[in-house]
Every structure is written in structure tokens, then in C-alpha cells.
A protein has these predicted regions:
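Membrane-interface aromatic/basic loop that binds lipid-linked glycans or pyrophosphate carriers
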Residues: 238-312
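Short aromatic/hydrophobic "clamp" motif used to bind/position activated sugar donors
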Residues: 44
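Short, conserved SAM-binding/catalytic segment
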Residues: 9-15, 64
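Short, conserved active-site loop motifs that form the nucleotide-linked donor/cofactor pocket
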Residues: 17-19
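Catalytic core of nucleotide-sugar-dependent glycosyltransferases
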Residues: 173-181, 187-215, 228-262
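Donor-binding/catalytic cores of nucleotide-activated saccharide
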Residues: 28, 49-168, 176-192
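Short, small-residue-biased leader/transition segments that mark boundaries at the very start
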Residues: 1-7
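Glycine-rich, basic loop-to-helix element that forms the pyrophosphate-binding segment
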Residues: 23-39
Length: 312
């Protein structure tokens, strides 16, 4: 990190447009918020430290906004980088202003998943690194990342930010390289996985109430609550580094399913908001068949690693 800081500082001395912020590690949300506060540019985009961008990343975005001055958010494609292979992900087949249906689909996606033509569509809509945001859209609406949300900050941010405007432009070009790391923070044992999910749930409910969103959003939210238990099981309950015995783990899971919002979501979840695999997961969740749930979690991890897909 020291050498990286020196490189950034040297560039800042050469070009006064570059601002380097030195601060104690307070989490990615605080770092991003400070970056937004310091930003003097008309547009903001984000890059995660493990990833990289195409050489034409900035110039492509700059040229796109010059031709589409009334847009507030630009979306662009990306490349998933795995050991030994890459996968290019496209949102649609051509560039252009996104119509009302696309806007609706993208707005509701952070509450559950992206649906295109009535079917789940595998594309990272909830992240911030494949978008460019108008700075005034963020600052004028007090759009900040939630510091308590040490996981899934992007999703909360987009769940709210995408409600602020319907002026989205899509660029049919892969500009960003998302690097998949098996040992990344998103795959490590995390005793606070459930806490971070619950921070997100609080914010989803806040956003739905703030914008008076329809029942469709609530249904998507209920589906997200119950299916996010998968990540809790993957990162905590059934993770190999969890040293608690089976009975203790199962008792903890019982206590979780008995409390809000899980008990409420399990009663209200609409099957039409679930994929086939999620329906199976929720079925055994309602039955509290934890042995089968562990089998499903372990099997999905194996399958995802074989297919080279990002674990959710």
C-alpha cells in the first residue's frame, strides 16, 4: 500500500486535477463519501481496488455524456475476470437511452434481481463500478453510502439513487474488468454477515417508504430477505471456518427465522419473485431442513466455481 500511495501522490503533484485523500481506514463507504464530497467534476465513477478499466474508459464516458447532456446516469458493460478465462457481460444489444420498461427493471433490481422479458437476467445492475453518475444528482439529493453497511453498500446506494431520475443511458461497450477472487472479502468467513444483511434490510424499507414505492417493490424485498439467508449460510452458518457445533448452529438459525424481518418475509414471499433454485431453497427454509440447506449451499458453491459465476 505504501508504494501505491507514493505513486498516487506523485501524480497529484504533477496534475492538480488529481486529489489524494489520506485517512484512517474507516471502511469503503466512508472513503467513497469523502471522495464524493471532494469531487469538483461534473461526473463520478468508481473503481474497486482489485479491478481495472479499459484505456478508453474515461474517454468513452466523456464522449457519451457530451452527446447526451440531459442524462443523469450512464451504464456500461464489463468483463468478468477469472483464472484462465474471461466473460463479457452485455446489458442489451445496442447503445442508447433506456426506455420506461428498462428504467423500471433497473430500479427494482436492487431489491431482488434484474428481470428482462419476465425472466431473471444475469447482469451486475446493483454495483456502482459499471456506472457513471452526475455529481449534482448525488450531492443535491444527499446521496451517500451507508457507513454501517460494510457489505453490499453498492446495492443500497443504487436502490435509492436509481429512484432519483429516469434519465439513464446505456453504452454497449465493455469498459470495466471485474476480477473474481476466490479468497476475496466477499467469500471469507464473516461472523457479521447476517448483521450486514439486516443493515441493508433497514435501508431497503426506508427507501420503499421514502419514495412510496408500490407493492411490487415490497414483494421483491421479501424475496431478497429470505434469499439473502443463503449468503448468511455460505459466509457464516455453514462456512468451514465456523467452529460451532451443528446443534448450536441450528439453534441460531431457528432464532433467526423466528424474528423480524425473516418471519414476516417467509409468510409474505411471492413465489413469482423467486427463481427455480430459490423456490427450492425457500421450501426447505420454511421446513427448517438445515441439513438439506447445507447441501444446497455447498452444491451451489461448487457449481458456481465450475461455471465461473460470481457468488451472491
Amino acid at each position: 500500500m505504501g508504494s501505491e500511495m507514493c505513486i498516487r501522490d506523485r501524480y497529484a503533484k504533477k496534475d492538480n486535477r488529481i486529489i489524494v485523500i489520506h485517512q484512517k481506514n474507516a471502511g469503503v463507504s466512508v472513503a467513497r463519501n469523502n471522495g464524493i464530497k471532494e469531487a469538483k467534476t461534473e461526473w463520478i465513477t468508481f473503481v474497486d481496488p482489485d479491478d481495472w478499466v479499459e484505456p478508453t474508459h474515461v474517454s468513452t464516458l466523456y464522449n457519451a455524456q457530451k452527446k447526451n447532456r440531459d442524462m443523469d446516469i450512464f451504464l456500461f458493460d464489463y468483463i468478468q475476470e477469472f483464472d484462465g478465462k474471461t466473460i463479457v457481460k452485455h446489458l442489451k444489444s445496442d447503445s442508447g437511452i433506456l426506455d420506461e420498461e428498462w428504467v423500471h427493471n433497473l430500479r427494482i433490481a436492487p431489491f431482488n434481481f434484474l428481470v428482462v422479458n419476465g425472466k431473471p437476467y444475469e447482469y451486475e445492475t446493483n454495483v456502482i463500478w459499471n456506472k457513471m453518475y452526475r455529481t449534482s444528482l448525488l450531492k443535491d439529493n444527499d446521496m451517500w453510502f451507508v457507513p454501517k453497511a460494510r457489505k453490499g453498500q453498492d446495492v443500497i446506494f443504487n436502490a435509492e439513487c436509481l429512484q432519483l431520475t429516469d434519465k439513464y443511458f446505456y453504452i454497449h461497450k465493455a469498459l470495466y474488468h471485474y476480477r473474481y477472487l476466490q479468497e476475496s472479502v466477499t467469500n471469507r468467513f464473516n461472523e457479521k454477515a447476517q448483521y450486514y444483511n439486516e443493515v441493508a434490510f433497514e435501508n431497503y424499507e426506508r427507501i420503499i417508504n421514502k419514495f412510496l414505492l408500490s407493492e411490487e417493490y415490497w414483494n421483491a424485498y421479501y424475496a431478497r430477505v429470505v434469499t439473502r439467508l443463503y449468503s448468511c449460510m455460505r459466509l457464516y452458518y455453514f462456512h468451514p471456518d465456523n467452529k460451532k457445533d451443528k446443534n448450536t448452529t441450528y439453534t441460531e438459525l431457528d432464532d433467526t427465522l423466528d424474528k423480524y424481518p425473516y418471519c414476516d418475509a417467509l409468510k409474505k414471499v411471492d413465489g413469482s419473485c423467486l427463481t427455480k433454485s430459490q423456490k427450492v431453497f425457500v421450501y426447505f427454509l420454511k421446513k427448517r431442513n438445515y441439513g438439506m440447506l447445507k447441501f444446497l449451499v455447498d452444491g451451489r458453491i461448487w457449481l458456481k466455481n465450475i461455471k465461473g459465476a460470481r457468488l451472491k
